[in-house]
Regions:
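Divalent metal-dependent catalytic cores for phosphoryl transfer on phosphate-bearing substrates
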Residues: 46-157
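Acidic/His-rich, divalent-metal-binding segments that scaffold phosphate/diphosphate chemistry
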Residues: 1-79
């Protein structure tokens, strides 16, 4: 599935957020690909290869909150603290669109709200790690997180 085809049925608000993503910068340390829209297209492309509609929706929504939360930090780099919570609220707001396309809103919400937490596993205390690993969607969150990892960026993906 192509990104542009997938978002044809998206509510106008989501299309507006995606357009704002084009103008939302990211730290080149974590995102050598550039702006949030380019990143979203790469994550979507990786998710689409699985054929799992839930991953595709999570890819669309996971960083939309960066349009509202991105700021220069004290080190002069871009940070988007808490963007996953804004993004997760958008999933709930647009649950009718998500479910009308055959996706599981609860799973999409869990993938979106958890996509940053899984990256912090090593910093969690053991009991918190075990609690997170016990989540019913843990393996899916882990897989989705791999789509979001730009350390594995290919030249082909940069051209998306």
């Amino acid at each position: 599935m192509e990104f542009s085809k997938f978002i044809e049925t998206a509510p106008e608000e989501i299309k507006d957020y995606l357009e704002k993503c084009r103008k939302t910068p990211q730290s080149p340390t974590w995102h050598p690909e550039g702006d949030v829209l380019k990143h979203t297209k790469i994550v979507f492309s990786r998710a689409a290869k699985t054929g799992d509609i839930n991953y595709m929706f999570a890819a669309i929504f996971h960083d939309l909150g960066k349009t509202e939360s991105t700021k220069l930090n004290k080190r002069g780099s871009w940070s988007s603290y808490g963007h996953e919570f804004i993004s997760a609220r958008l999933v709930i707001k647009h649950k009718d669109w998500i479910s009308s396309q055959g996706a599981d809103v609860d799973l999409v919400h869990d993938l979106v709200i958890s996509h940053m937490k899984i990256k912090m596993m090593d910093e969690m205390r053991k009991p918190k790690q075990e609690e997170f690993k016990a989540k019913p969607n843990y393996e899916k969150i882990k897989e989705f997180s791999s789509f979001d990892n730009m350390k594995t960026l290919t030249p082909e993906e940069l051209s998306l």
